[in-house]
A protein has these predicted regions:
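ABC ATPase NBD coupling module
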Residues: 15, 69-85, 114
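The feature captures the beta-strand-to-loop junction immediately N-terminal to the Walker
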Residues: 37-39
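Conserved coupling/switch loops of ABC nucleotide-binding domains, chiefly the family-specific signature
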Residues: 58-61, 116
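Conserved ABC transporter NBD signature motif
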Residues: 60-68
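Short helical segment in ABC ATPase nucleotide-binding domains corresponding to the A-loop/adjacent helical element
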Residues: 100-108, 118
């Protein structure tokens, strides 16, 4: 489950402040498939980066599963991210690996057991 309540995010630029997210609200239930669509510069990537704590919001709350992302310390956030899947806009795959191996790789280096990796992939 993902719950986003009134989040806002502003960036400082050489020409002034740019408000990229303003009072965004969103609910995604377990099992739902959800996409974020919009024009270039609309804030899609910023929203996703806020959901997993790569960007800090200026205000509002984000809950993913049982974790309030906006209140986690670094260690807690690192552990919470292990249960959050994200596909970056630009990413690289290892040409020498199969699809399965590419998906399993980050789980392996995070210390997951082989049987858990098999289940997640």
């Amino acid at each position: 489950m993902i719950s986003v309540k009134n989040i806002s995010k502003t960036f400082n630029t050489p020409t002034g402040k740019v408000e990229v997210l303003k009072n965004v609200n969103l609910e995604v239930e377990d099992g739902d498939v959800f996409g974020v669509v919009g024009f270039s510069g609309a804030g899609k990537s910023t929203l996703i980066r806020c959901l997993n704590g790569l960007e800090k919001v200026d205000s509002g709350t984000i809950i993913v599963g049982e974790n309030e992302i906006t209140k986690l310390d670094r260690k807690q956030l690192r552990n919470a991210r292990k249960k959050i899947g994200m596909i970056f806009q630009q990413f690289n795959l290892f040409d020498s690996k199969t699809v399965y191996e590419n998906i399993a790789f980050p789980l392996e280096i995070s210390g997951y057991k082989k049987e858990n990796i098999r289940e997640r992939v």
